């Protein structure tokens, strides 16, 4: 996405954390849920860190193939209802070749405004995410900002996450984003997932995107994901493959690992 991204693996040493943060700098919302562009209405538990990592992925647009490696999102649980999110990815053109660029970098705050089905309570879960978009190393050199609203509802048959957001892009254009994520039953070890979204960068271009994939929930603090995405951006086709993992660990002794919900499984 171009204004909101920015989906929770865990690192084991402070050196790994610093390395991931260095990687965290196109415009997109703070995606905090792999392998989607949107996110869910849940946050990391207080005192814990979640890491969303794509070791390698690829996209193809206008006859050019780009390696996306790595793509990193770090989620720090600040309190029961709030987390800090840092993200970024490295893009390297392969054909034709070109210099690598640090893109989609940003820093965000995400908060649960209403606890609901994702927190093992009744009704929808409602959250917001807002923050700053950092300049790209090879692209737009300005700063931007984004604001996103999220509503999630879980049933026995599956889960739906609705996203609506607005942004000021790095080149200072207005941007809106509307998306929906659908997941299979949370009790399934491997659940099918899908996402559709529409994004409009005013006076520039609009994007219609669809993704299908699967999430393998190994445990509460470890999952693997894969997704295939097809989009039309400014009249041009974009094809992308995503594969990664999400893991987590406590930043202090004695904490349990997971999100402030009944887990995504």
Q: For the regions a protein language model found, what residue spans apply to each?
A:
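Transmembrane beta-barrel domains of Gram-negative outer membranes and organellar outer membranes
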Residues: 30-265
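Cleavable N-terminal export/targeting peptides
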Residues: 1-35, 252-265
């Amino acid at each position: 996405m171009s204004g909101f991204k920015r989906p929770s693996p865990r690192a084991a040493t402070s050196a790994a954390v610093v390395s991931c943060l260095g990687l965290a700098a196109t415009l997109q919302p703070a995606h905090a849920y792999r392998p989607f562009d949107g996110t869910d209405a849940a946050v990391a538990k207080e005192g814990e860190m979640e890491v969303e990592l794509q070791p390698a992925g690829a996209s193809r647009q206008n006859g050019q193939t780009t390696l996306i490696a790595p793509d990193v999102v770090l989620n720090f649980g600040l309190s029961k209802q709030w987390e800090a999110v840092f993200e970024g990815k490295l893009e390297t053109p392969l054909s034709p070749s070109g210099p690598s660029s640090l893109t989609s970098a940003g820093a965000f705050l995400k908060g649960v405004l209403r606890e609901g089905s994702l927190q093992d309570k009744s009704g929808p879960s409602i959250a917001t995410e807002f923050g700053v978009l950092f300049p790209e190393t090879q692209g737009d050199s300005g700063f931007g900002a984004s604001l996103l609203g999220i509503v999630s509802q879980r049933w026995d048959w599956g889960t739906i996450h609705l996203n609506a957001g607005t942004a000021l892009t790095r080149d200072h254009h207005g941007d809106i984003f509307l998306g929906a994520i659908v997941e299979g039953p949370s009790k399934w070890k491997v659940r099918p997932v899908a996402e559709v979204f529409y994004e409009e960068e005013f006076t520039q271009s609009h994007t219609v995107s669809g993704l299908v994939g699967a999430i393998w929930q190994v445990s509460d603090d470890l999952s693997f994901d894969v997704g295939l995405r097809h989009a039309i951006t400014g009249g041009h086709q974009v094809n992308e493959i995503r594969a990664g993992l999400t893991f987590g660990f406590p930043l202090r002794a004695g904490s349990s690992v997971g999100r402030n919900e009944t887990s995504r499984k």
